[in-house]
């Protein structure tokens, strides 16, 4: 939806249709989910070949007559990835990148992809990542890819790959995607990432996993065929569970899941400028997930008129945001020492180089913004909920 003037408040993450998060994704009513998502104004889809079999399932759904009779290809955006194949298998070679893009085009039955990301760039060398970006830029010049991106968790690596790519090709990386770095538990995308990305020409950031990969919700992390893959240590899990229980008792119409979603959406919107956009990607695998996420978003956004379409909700509802400050403050206080905990085990750093646990983080208890890398069981790291 390149014609949309405002960045999407919510992007549908396709990892919900993967074996990592669902033992039987083929059984999901994906056509119904996509139809309802499009009706509600969730028109951008993010996935990856790594989220097997998400691309195949969504490609088949998008070719269904019920969707094709109502929506043109230009009515929605498709974002996918290249380079990551399995949990411990990557292929960033130019030949494979080209094959992967061609395969995604075939699976989606389209002649172009809106965004293609190099997937989890921190797991390969800087040279491999930069070379892969160059291959995607070739596709961009041919009109096959509209925007070129890189994705991963590590902000330092993302910023360095973007810098090196711009230096080598005299063309910026258009888009960055990072996961679990703009949440109630971790705001390092804001405190350490956005300024660095802007400085090297990035104009759009997608922050996925607003629930910290399923951590910030009642019931704990989701389990797929890969079992308990979550990188959070037990202390953080316990703090999140305590916060979820407190929200169930005292959160009123909100639970920890909806509050975390709203916090991420508000943070994203507050960091948007006319030349730099931030959006939230959330995993969706059921109609209930979709409806609840859209309702949560609308509670902190406002539209010019009475509309069901989330695309019309382009501004923050300042009164609603203000009313949630105390809840956000309480949850972040309960997370305590685990604020900005890095899932890779690295100590988070502020811009002045100090450990984030050695200083009081700006906005540590406020929703308002100021104007070993090989993870165990990482099959779902970057699989986003």
Each language-model region and where it sits:
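Acidic (Asp/Glu)-rich catalytic clusters
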Residues: 2-6, 61-77, 105-110, 138-140, ...
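Conserved, mostly hydrophobic/aromatic
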Residues: 12, 45, 58, 78, ...
């Amino acid at each position: 939806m390149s014609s949309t003037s405002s960045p999407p408040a919510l992007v549908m993450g396709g990892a919900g249709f993967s074996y990592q998060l669902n033992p039987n994704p083929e059984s999901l009513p994906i056509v119904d989910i996509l139809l309802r998502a499009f009706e509600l104004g969730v028109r951008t889809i993010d996935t990856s070949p790594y989220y097997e079999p998400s691309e195949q399932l969504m490609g088949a759904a998008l070719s269904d007559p019920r969707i094709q009779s109502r929506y043109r290809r230009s009515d929605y955006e498709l974002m996918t990835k290249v380079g990551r194949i399995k949990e411990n298998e990557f292929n960033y070679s130019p030949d494979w990148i080209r094959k992967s893009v061609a395969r995604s085009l075939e699976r989606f039955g389209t002649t172009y992809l809106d965004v293609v990301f190099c997937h989890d760039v921190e797991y390969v060398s800087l040279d491999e990542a930069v070379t892969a970006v160059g291959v995607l830029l070739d596709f961009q010049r041919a009109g096959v890819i509209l925007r070129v991106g890189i994705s991963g968790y590590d902000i330092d690596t993302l910023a360095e790959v973007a810098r090196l790519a711009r230096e080598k090709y005299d063309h910026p990386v258009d888009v960055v995607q990072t996961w679990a770095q703009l949440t109630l538990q971790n705001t390092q995308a804001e405190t350490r990432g956005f300024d660095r990305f802007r400085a090297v020409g990035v104009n759009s950031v997608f922050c996925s996993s607003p629930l910290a990969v399923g951590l910030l919700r009642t019931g704990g992390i989701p389990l797929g065929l890969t079992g308990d893959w979550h990188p959070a240590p037990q202390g953080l899990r316990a703090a999140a569970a305590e916060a979820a229980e407190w929200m169930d008792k005292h959160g009123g119409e909100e639970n920890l899941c909806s509050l975390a979603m709203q916090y991420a959406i508000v943070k994203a919107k507050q960091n948007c400028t006319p030349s730099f956009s931030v959006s939230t990607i959330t995993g969706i695998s059921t109609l209930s997930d979709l409806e609840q996420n859209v309702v949560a978003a609308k509670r902190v956004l406002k539209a010019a008129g009475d509309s069901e379409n989330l695309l019309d909700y382009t501004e923050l509802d300042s009164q609603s945001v203000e009313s949630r400050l105390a809840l956000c403050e309480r949850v972040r206080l309960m997370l305590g020492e685990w604020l900005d905990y890095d899932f890779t085990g690295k100590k988070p750093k502020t811009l002045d180089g100090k450990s984030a646990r050695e200083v009081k983080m700006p906005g540590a208890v406020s929703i308002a913004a100021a104007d070993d890398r090989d993870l165990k069981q990482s099959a779902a790291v970057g699989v986003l909920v």
